[in-house]
């Protein structure tokens, strides 16, 4: 959506190495530090250790729940309940305003702990509607969870796929557990691979950004890694993260105890280079813990070992608006702080076309408009204003509309396909312009034109309502 031709300045255009991605994918990935090589210098992430169980035993993994001295996937210092997790997210988001994404990556598999995982995601979506949600999984039960992931607003999913050969899979995995049955050997590999591919295809068909993680294991799966990249790219995955095997005896894994060699830097680089011919590569992965907090390569989890009382936490919406201004400033290199810059909201099913009725929108895409260009800042989720065909009048949903007004208090305009007369008037009373002239058109056409027309008519000191 953002292009150098959108505005004269062009300072916020995507880096050249994002050229393999569509504009929509590049915009969505830009603020996710694990999905964007440039984003990880500017935005922070948080992993929530709420998922202890696993349905797949990998020979390179040994889960630990009370470990503070190992830096690798599958370990955490503690386990959190969903209720504790959302308190911790609020605590961290207040302390680290660069936080853009919260993910569940273990210590086991999130989808093997489906009740805990979805309760956590639902609480975050309800209480912190602007945070990006992601999840990392082995993919075994992914096909069964796609619809629920979409419903709760997860739009980034990482799937660990180490091979597409069932015989090789039998060397990597000791067993899997599915529908009350335990499988091993080639049979387990066939089941796992089929379900992983099905899950990836279903996610990408729904517009979810899928990253593939693969552990490079010399002498086992290294020769077939380019085939993994090729097949998963064809299935719609957009980036491949090839990670070196960690196999040290002190970690207690099968490979570590059996002396399986780790790949050297040259082997890893050569494999990434071959795979990069068919699929963009992630090369900045730090193989984070299941409780990592902060920028990539900067784990601040030990600063947040004590949970505050929920009632002691400040209201979230003022923090949300402050964070939006900061994230816009980061993404535009300060241009969003100019007097003629502003934030706007778009009612859209996926962010690139204005295609939703105001009352039917369950999320708004927030864009920064400035001399730097049009930049996607975040998505904000909300209960729909209209709950049905006959429930779209203010007397029926005053509380819902008030909540939407509070959520959008820092924007100058709302773009949608249609909007009722009463909410139109109420938005105008709050200084928010309802815009329907761009219905069914790309945001990349409508928003820049609107900004160019309006920018000269605003006062020199443009107030940002709702921002403390």
UniProtKB/Swiss-Prot annotation:
S-adenosyl-L-methionine binds at residues 60, 108, 160, 212. Its cofactor is [4Fe-4S] cluster. InterPro entries: Aldolase_TIM (IPR013785), Di-Nase_FeMo-co_biosynth (IPR003731), DiNase_FeMo-co_biosyn_sf (IPR036105), Elp3/MiaA/NifB-like_rSAM (IPR006638), MoaA_NifB_PqqE_Fe-S-bd_CS (IPR000385), Nase_CF_NifB (IPR005980), NifB_C (IPR034165), rSAM (IPR007197). Binds 3 [4Fe-4S] clusters per monomer. One cluster is coordinated with 3 cysteines and an exchangeable S-adenosyl-L-methionine. The two others probably act as substrate. [4Fe-4S] cluster 1 binds at residues 54, 58, 61. Its EC number is 4.-.-.-. GO terms for molecular function: 4 iron, 4 sulfur cluster binding; lyase activity; metal ion binding. Residues 40-289 form the Radical SAM core domain. Involved in the biosynthesis of the iron-molybdenum cofactor (FeMo-co or M-cluster) found in the dinitrogenase enzyme of the nitrogenase complex in nitrogen-fixing microorganisms. NifB catalyzes the crucial step of radical SAM-dependent carbide insertion that occurs concomitant with the insertion of a 9th sulfur and the rearrangement/coupling of two [4Fe-4S] clusters into a [8Fe-9S-C] cluster, the precursor to the M-cluster. Belongs to the radical SAM superfamily. NifB family. This is FeMo cofactor biosynthesis protein NifB. It comes from Klebsiella pneumoniae. The gene is nifB.
């Amino acid at each position: 959506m953002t292009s150098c031709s959108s505005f004269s300045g062009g300072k916020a255009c995507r880096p050249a190495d994002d050229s393999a991605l569509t504009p929509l994918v590049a915009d969505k990935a830009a603020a996710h530090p694990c999905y964007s090589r440039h984003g990880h210098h500017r935005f922070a992430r948080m992993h929530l250790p709420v998922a202890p169980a696993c349905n797949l035993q990998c020979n390179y993994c040994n889960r630990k729940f009370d470990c503070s001295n190992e830096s690798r996937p599958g370990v955490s210092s503690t386990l959190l309940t969903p209720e504790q997790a959302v308190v911790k997210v609020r605590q961290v988001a207040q302390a680290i305003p660069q936080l853009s994404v919260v993910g569940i990556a273990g210590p086991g598999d999130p989808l093997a702990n489906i009740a805990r995982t979805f309760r956590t995601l639902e609480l975050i979506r309800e209480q912190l509607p602007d945070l990006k949600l992601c999840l990392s999984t082995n993919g075994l039960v992914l096909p069964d969870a796609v619809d629920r992931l979409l419903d709760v607003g997860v739009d980034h999913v990482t799937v660990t796929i180490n091979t597409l050969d069932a015989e090789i899979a039998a060397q990597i995995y000791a067993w899997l557990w599915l529908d009350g049955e335990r499988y091993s050997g080639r049979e387990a590999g066939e089941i796992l691979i089929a379900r992983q591919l099905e899950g990836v295809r279903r996610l990408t068909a729904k517009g979810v950004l899928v990253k593939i993680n693969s552990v490079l294991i010399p002498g086992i799966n290294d020769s077939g890694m380019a085939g993994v990249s090729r097949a998963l790219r064809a299935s719609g995955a957009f980036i491949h993260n090839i990670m070196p095997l960690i196999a040290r005896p002190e970690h207690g894994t099968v490979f570590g105890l059996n002396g399986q060699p780790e790949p050297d830097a040259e082997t890893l680089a050569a494999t990434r280079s071959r795979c990069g011919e068919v699929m963009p590569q992630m090369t900045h992965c730090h193989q984070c813990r299941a409780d990592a907090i902060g920028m990539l390569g900067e784990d601040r989890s030990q600063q947040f070992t004590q949970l505050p009382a929920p009632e002691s936490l400040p209201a979230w919406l003022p923090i949300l608006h402050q964070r939006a201004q900061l994230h816009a400033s980061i993404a535009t290199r300060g241009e969003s702080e100019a007097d003629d810059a502003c934030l706007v909201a778009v009612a859209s099913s996926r962010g690139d076309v204005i295609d939703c009725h105001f009352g039917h929108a369950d999320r708004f895409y927030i864009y920064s408009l400035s001399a730097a260009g049009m930049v996607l800042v975040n998505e904000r989720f909300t209960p729909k204003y209209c709950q049905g065909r006959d429930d779209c009048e203010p007397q029926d949903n005053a509380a819902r509309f008030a909540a939407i007004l509070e959520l959008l208090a820092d924007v100058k305009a709302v773009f949608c396909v249609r909007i009722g007369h009463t909410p139109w008037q109420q938005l105008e009373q709050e200084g928010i312009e309802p815009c329907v002239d761009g219905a069914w058109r790309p945001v990349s056409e409508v928003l820049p034109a609107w900004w160019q027309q309006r920018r000269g008519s605003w006062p020199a000191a443009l107030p940002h309502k709702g921002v403390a």
